[in-house]
Amino acid sequence: PALTLVAFFYNPDLDIVRSQWAAARGSLVAAGGRPNPGVTGGPGYNATTPVADITPWILSLNLDFTITTAGKRSNQIAAARHQSESARLAVASAAWSVRQQVRQQSLDLYAATRAIVLLERQQRAHELNVSLLARRLAAGEISPFELAQARLLDGANRASLNDARRQEAEARVSLAAALGLTVHALDGISLAFDAFERPAPALPDADVRRQALLNRADVLAALERYEASQSVLRLEIARQYPDIHLGPGYQMDQDNLKWSLDLGGILPVFNRNRGAIAEAEARRAEAAASFTSVQSKAIEQVDGAIAAYTAATATLASSDALVADRERMQRSAAAQFAAGEISRVELAAIELTLAGAETERLNARIRAQQALGRLEDAMQSPAVFADWVFTDPSRTPPTKKR
């Protein structure tokens, strides 16, 4: 969680969607604005008035107030509000993507770090095994082939160790980039990976599907875009009906003070806004198809993630059982070695078998965590239901008081 908060603050990708959301909020304010009144006025001159008797000048002032009809303003506000909500959900979607990047890069760093620990342990075991076999070869107890095989395994382990160290360095760079920092910003910082070593949570399939459909930002954003297109269609239909123009006027004609009140509007004779309505209907159909597509892809992604997670957790359970069995064998072999029943070479071979099982368990754990990340990405929610932080609070039922 701490790394995620750092990424939310420093990652530049979020600044882009935040700016887009701010622009959408500005559009919402603009949509709610009322039209300003118009004003005209000026002097006039009556050429038939005798100048000696009375002034021939006429002063007039006319106002023009627009009264919107047929709910145009409310539909315009509704469309802008749905577009603003879609932009807000885009921020949530981008934030989730950043969170997943941080999690994936943290998992890669954990995998490389743990692999280094296991490979260094195996390296010590391989070196001991090569040393013991060299002594037995010198004593004529084994053939050179056995020592050559041990040295090949030792060399392969060294190569794997060097590769793991390279992966660790690359993972630190990738993690720093996901956080929006330089790699040197992570120098001297101890990162905890306890979350990756916890038992995999059991996630009911029905709850996962429900959470995905109710919580995924892309699904909700597609729904908001459809609602916005619906409001735009209503707005275009309402524009068939003209607005009313109310025009009070005042005129000072010599000694006569006159006022007037005009009513005006556009006659919808030649243009009934059919073209704009047809375009809005097509865009609404497009938004509906887009929502259906996004929802179908979400369901497909959830089903695939559930299957992958189920298989990965089963493999991890088998790896745990295998490591437990190898640990029992190692303890038994250590007791036999202490009693002088087996040689140090035989004990080293069993220890290498245990190290290999631990490596397989690490790989299984990484695959399980990757599958869990894929499942979380399908839901766009953390796997622990109690820790869902992207859920809309308004959708959460209130707690009943007793």
What kind of feature is each model-predicted range?
Residues A312-R344:
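C-terminal hydrophobic structural anchor segments
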Residues P1-G32, N36, E141, S190-E227, ...:
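Bacterial Sec-pathway N-terminal export signals of envelope proteins
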Residues P37-A47, P242-M252:
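Transmembrane beta-strand segments that form the barrel wall of outer-membrane beta-barrel proteins
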Residues L5-I16, A22-P37, T48-D53, L61-A79, ...:
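A glycine-/polar-enriched beta->alpha junction
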Residues R73, H82, L89-Q211, A305-A308, ...:
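Periplasmic alpha-helical coiled-coil/stalk elements that build and connect Gram-negative outer-membrane
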Residues A2, P56-I58, Q104, Q149, ...:
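Transmembrane beta-barrel architecture of outer-membrane proteins
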Residues V183, E360-R402:
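Acidic, low-complexity, intrinsically disordered peripheral segments
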Residues A164, A217, A364:
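Metallo-beta-lactamase
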